[in-house]
Amino acid sequence: MKEPGAWNRRNFLATLGATAVAAFPGKVLARSRQAAGVASKSGSVYDDLGVKTIINAWGTITDIGGSLISPETVAAMESASKNFVSIEELLEVTGNRIAQMLKDLPADHTATITSGAAGAIMCGVSGVLTGVDPDKIRQLPDLTGMKSEVIFQRGHYETYGYCPQIRASGTKIVLVDFPEDVHRAINEKTALLYFANYANPLGHIKVDEWIKLGKQYNIPCFNDCAADTPPVGNLTAFNKMGYDLVAFSGGKGLRGPQCSGLLLGRKDLVHAARYNSSPFEPTLGRGMKVGKEEIVGMWKALEIYLSQDQSKLMQEWSAKLDYVAKQLRKLDGVSTSYYVPPIANHVPAMQISWDPRKFALTSKTALDYLGSGNPAVAMWGGGPGASETMEDDCYLTMSSFMLQPGEERIVASRLKQMFHAHPA
């Protein structure tokens, strides 16, 4: 029996959440503002540093900070910063809590909080190779006597930026195109079948077919779904489909800390991934550290995300795009059209196009103009039909789900200024 006043893991998270929610938005928000005033002479730490802020009409992009953390999550992180705890125990408890929160997650699955989706990939692949064997964990990236090959589709590989995280554990990536290639490639060295969810349209083997190949040979399958929330259902859809490990970014649609992520999957593989990461040593993933504040922040952010009315949010995001479109329709030679990306950043988006005979602008010069203001406005020069250089393109793609209230008006004003400043 614990002594009075001793830390009790059973009620730590419940107490923490209740404290943060009960205090918000009054005392905690006031305290946060007071702390911000102490931290910044000007009212903005970025002004103090001379770093220009950005209005994010682009999306959950790591280059510009991903997403903004909610005040409730900040309050939970602040509370977590006030005590020391066992990181190993905190990871176990939050992982179990998250598995309970995701009610559709298969019964033999659990979760762990990671250092972003990239950390989930690196430690998840390592865990598949080593299990919880301390000698094998210590041996990485030397795979002598261990399985060493990861099968990946060529159509995914050509646009995928996270192969270094796969290879970090010493693996060799074997590229395939068609199911018959997979059958030929599988051998006694095959450790994993790897899938990049956003690239599903680019490969010949689709997401549901890929898992069937893994099951046929009893080989674990990993799916990188980093930016694939919303929709909420994606958080469990691929585990239910049969994927053994699924990675999500915490700092994108979930609006958790930018350096956090989620790894969901079979309990044995999730535990193995955790033992290949911080705070355990010696491990390949020792540098994949997530602090206690970020662990708690990721848990709280997910709790908030699951409680939100997603259809209402979609309507709000669409309304912001409608406002900008209405302002731009007043300009002769400018048009707008709506679409929703099929997988990653699956939220309302708008393509803004212009007639090059009326405006001396390309996608690249438009992005440069918007980025030159203070605050800058960030958009995407890509989208359906985009070229690599954007030198000849005449459109931008705008996303609204990272805009703060009222920023759509600034975006519309800046766009109108841009068009007026660049007549053909």
Which ranges hold each PLM region?
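Conserved PLP-enzyme active-site core in the AAT-like
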Residues: 13-16, 20, 37-55, 59-64, ...
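Flexible, glycine/charged-enriched surface loops at secondary-structure junctions
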Residues: 87-92, 107-111, 285-289, 308-317, ...
